[in-house]
Amino acid sequence: MRPQGPAASPQRLRGLLLLLLLQLPAPSSASEIPKGKQKAQLRQREVVDLYNGMCLQGPAGVPGRDGSPGANGIPGTPGIPGRDGFKGEKGECLRESFEESWTPNYKQCSWSSLNYGIDLGKIAECTFTKMRSNSALRVLFSGSLRLKCRNACCQRWYFTFNGAECSGPLPIEAIIYLDQGSPEMNSTINIHRTSSVEGLCEGIGAGLVDVAIWVGTCSDYPKGDASTGWNSVSRIIIEELPK
């Protein structure tokens, strides 16, 4: 009987080897052993040689624990360039005021002592170069103003641009009103006080602009005795501003 493979039990194999060894005859010369027995002995020796020293497989061991994490690998090679993206939508053009950097543009005209005592008409003028048509003009008149009368009166100081008052959005003006005198209040007191007329005007085209300060009457009130720029510096300041 031959073993059926390495899966045979150790006890069975040891028993087979012992049986073969017991059947071996005592040593003698080859000439005295019949050929049939010689073949049987040779076959037994082959079986002994085949299984002698064989390591038999034992039962499976307990699964081992997880190993430590390995070291980081070397960096990979750069990938191939990606494909071009889809074409974007058409953008919108920015307005001129954002595309170009804004350059300050201003001017000042001043007079040391106007001493202008007219009650109606132009007081002073300053010519300005406006660079853009979509900008606004900031104007300022600063100087002493006075109004005197015995009865109630009113005077108005206002700006004009190329001979017309501002219409974008409204006129730029300042008024002084003086009430009728009384025994307690002497309205003939002569007071000169530094005041200002200031505002923004839009809708004026680019180019030369004649900016002037005028004095006139108020609606529904008589004029009085007006004075502008007495004994002090008067000035007109003009500045172009982005809208």
From Swiss-Prot:
Modified how: N-glycosylated.
Protein name: Collagen triple helix repeat-containing protein 1
Gene that produces this protein: CTHRC1
Top-level taxonomy: Eukaryota, Metazoa, Chordata, Craniata, Vertebrata
Signal peptide annotation: 1-30
Keywords: Collagen, Extracellular matrix, Glycoprotein, Secreted, Signal
Tissues expressing this chain: Isoform 1 is expressed in calcified atherosclerotic plaque and chondrocyte-like cells.
Localization per record: Secreted, Extracellular space, Extracellular matrix
Residues glycosylated per entry: N186
Organism: Homo sapiens (Human)
